[in-house]
Amino acid sequence: MAKLALIEREKKRARLVAKFAAKREALKAIIEDQSKSEEERYEARLELQQLPRNANPTRQRNRCAITGRPRGTFRKFGLARNKIREIAFRGEIPGLTKASW
């Protein structure tokens, strides 16, 4: 199990990303817009730099919903591989069966 502080840090990052998503998209649109003046684009770039680092979605890490494990997490289930295995063997994930050929 991951430390609770790490799990809480990821939750905080998720909240920050959601909070600043609209502002971030608007600033990026201004920066990419070639019809805007160079000064406007420069101001937007400076304003984008002033946003918190953790508001950037690339800083988020997918973690297991049960254990908080950062690696080996399946996006479809939101669980780590070992937890998927345990739950699947108990038959709690509908339609998921062990492969055989």
Curated annotation (Swiss-Prot):
InterPro entries recorded: Ribosomal_uS14, Ribosomal_uS14_bac/plastid
UniProt GO BP: translation
GO molecular function terms listed in the Swiss-Prot or TrEMBL record: rRNA binding; structural constituent of ribosome
Pfam family, one: Ribosomal_S14
One of the record's GO cellular component terms: cytoplasm
Highest taxon above the source species: Bacteria
SUPFAM superfamilies from the UniProt entry: Glucocorticoid receptor-like (DNA-binding domain)
Gene3D superfamilies in the record: 1.10.287.1480
Keyword Transcription assigned: no
Keywords, sorted A to Z: Ribonucleoprotein, Ribosomal protein, RNA-binding, rRNA-binding
Entry coiled-coil feature ranges: none
Functional note: Binds 16S rRNA, required for the assembly of 30S particles and may also be responsible for determining the conformation of the 16S rRNA at the A site.
Subunit structure: Part of the 30S ribosomal subunit. Contacts proteins S3 and S10.
UniProt xrefs under NCBIfam families: PRK08881.1
Similarity comment: Belongs to the universal ribosomal protein uS14 family.
Protein name stated in the entry: Small ribosomal subunit protein uS14
Organism this protein belongs to: Burkholderia multivorans (strain ATCC 17616 / 249)
Gene from which the chain derives: rpsN
